[in-house]
Amino acid sequence: MTRKISVITGGHGGMGKAIALELGKKTSVLLADMNEDKLNDVKSNLESLGIETFVKACDVTDKEQVQELASYADSLGDVVNVIHTSGVSPTLCKAPQVIRVNALGTVNMTDAFASIIADGGVMVNFSSVAAYQLETQDEWIDIFEQYYDSDELYDRLYELVEPFADNDFNCAGMAYCIAKRFVIYYSQMNVDRFARRHARILSVSPGSHLTPMHQALIDLQPEIAEGQLDDIPVGRWGHPYEISSLIAYLVSEQAAFLNGIDILQDGGQTAKTFVTQIGD
């Protein structure tokens, strides 16, 4: 029987590890991230639980490295799931890196796996609740549609945030919102492409979950984190296992008619923020 492979980028991050634990119940997993030592630590943990695990260092902003990842995955077996969680936060990175990792990395991953994903396979790209924080502008859509396959994509996206360049935090935050909106739109642009291989593609937009990246925000800017928590109607942060459970459902046969959509899992934060609430 041919081995079934779930490829997970951000493989040593909080969400990546949780997803590997969940999908590893039914498939082998290939973890990708930039730090191979950390990947091997996760590999040891997963293998101790009986999950066949492979690792490969990969910078998702590098097309050649992503193509090598796809070729390696294809050599291992049928690539049934591609879960692209890799991303960087505007609290830790400046706007150029935010755009390269979150937007260009998504293009590289989607392009590389669109031609090898197995019949019935599913790709899930990770966006963010931040994609819903700003109203999508027609100018953004024009750029998304005209430059998605162009070397100019980075330049065009950076032009949108350049007016904020005198403030690194605001510039990075704007870049993050736009890049994550791009992830949703670009995933939807690929529905037909994946359907030709009888595969599906979706995106998910997590709100604030207790991952190492979010813990860094809590540690660096506790007042901002406290304000965010106040805006979440369920009254708590999300947990990585809640994302992994969602992913397990989305790649299952039970979700076979879900395609080309974004799933917002934010505890009600977006609704509370942008929709007038009864009783207010």
Say what each PLM segment does.
Residues 83-90, 127, 268:
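Conserved NAD(P)H cofactor-binding loop of Rossmann-fold oxidoreductase domains
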